[in-house]
UniProtKB/Swiss-Prot annotation:
Protein name: Ribonuclease 3
The UniProt record lists the keyword tRNA processing: yes
Function: Digests double-stranded RNA. Involved in the processing of primary rRNA transcript to yield the immediate precursors to the large and small rRNAs (23S and 16S). Processes some mRNAs, and tRNAs when they are encoded in the rRNA operon. Processes pre-crRNA and tracrRNA of type II CRISPR loci if present in the organism.
Names of required cofactors: Mg(2+)
Domain of life: Bacteria
GO cellular component entries: cytoplasm
Keywords: Cytoplasm, Endonuclease, Hydrolase, Magnesium, Metal-binding, mRNA processing, Nuclease, RNA-binding, rRNA processing, rRNA-binding, tRNA processing
UniProt-annotated location(s): Cytoplasm
RNase III domain mapped to chain residues: 5-127
EC annotation from Swiss-Prot or TrEMBL: 3.1.26.3
Similarity annotation: Belongs to the ribonuclease III family.
Enzyme class, first EC level, given as a word: hydrolase
Native source species: Aromatoleum aromaticum (strain DSM 19018 / LMG 30748 / EbN1) (Azoarcus sp. (strain EbN1))
Subunit (UniProt): Homodimer.
Length: 225
């Protein structure tokens, strides 16, 4: 395990003073205790903060809502999964036998959670500056590729214009589910781009918010290199 972790640490650009933190970050709950669930919680907050700083410093012309949408697209499961794949993070995960047999090392949710846990482990190992350096290193290519003109548009508008530019039919939005009590409902909407066989699911406290998230996820798929 130590040799494999050396490779991962080189990819992260961070050498752990306490390698046990990194091992815990890579340990799924199916493997046993201690696992990475608590680290994932902390890493999510650290990632949101670092990405917010990066967007604030790089895009002085963007408004709060525009930066919030961009941050959401970068720190969502899809964004985390992309970074985790670049790190070959699945190769380093410690999973229970059943989870390993079912392909858990490829599952986007497990990879995304583990990456957030790695960010937390870096923070606990050497502080916020170290965690920020790792996140900046991994996320800079995606942030550098952002077009501020496109970012200023809401996701549904941006997706519509992108498809029109490619001479493709417009997307459709289908209400899939409504969860919760009347005073605290969560809406689930599916965005379908049938010409590309693309389906994404967004969630929000109202239908419009769910549609916007679904469109944002579709955009992220279409903008992949």
């Amino acid at each position: 395990m130590a040799g494999k972790l050396d490779r991962l640490q080189r990819s992260l650009g961070h050498r752990f003073d306490n390698p046990a933190l990194l091992e815990q970050a890579l340990t799924h709950r199916s493997f046993g205790q201690p696992n990475n669930e608590r680290l994932e919680f902390l890493g999510d907050s650290i990632l949101n903060c670092v990405v917010a700083i990066a967007l604030f410093e790089r895009f002085a012309s963007l408004r709060e809502g525009e930066m919030s949408r961009l941050r959401a697209s970068l720190v969502c499961q899809d964004g985390l999964h992309r970074v985790a794949l670049e790190l070959d993070l699945g190769e380093y995960l410690r999973l229970g036998e059943g989870e390993m047999k079912s392909g858990g090392f490829r599952r986007p949710s497990i990879l995304a959670d583990a990456l957030e846990a790695v960010f937390a482990a870096t923070f606990l190992d050497q502080g916020f500056a170290a965690a920020k350096a790792v996140i900046d290193r991994l996320y800079d290519p995606m942030i550098a590729a952002i077009d501020p003109g496109v970012a200023a548009k809401d996701p549904k508008t941006a997706l519509q214009e992108l498809l029109q530019g490619r001479k493709l039919p417009l997307p459709t939005y289908v209400m899939a589910k409504v969860h919760g009590e009347a005073h605290a409902q969560e809406f689930e909407v599916v965005c379908e781009v049938n010409a590309l066989n693309l389906r994404t699911t967004g969630r929000g406290t109202n239908r419009r918010a769910a549609e916007q998230q679904a469109a944002e996820l579709a955009l992220a798929q279409l903008r992949k290199p």
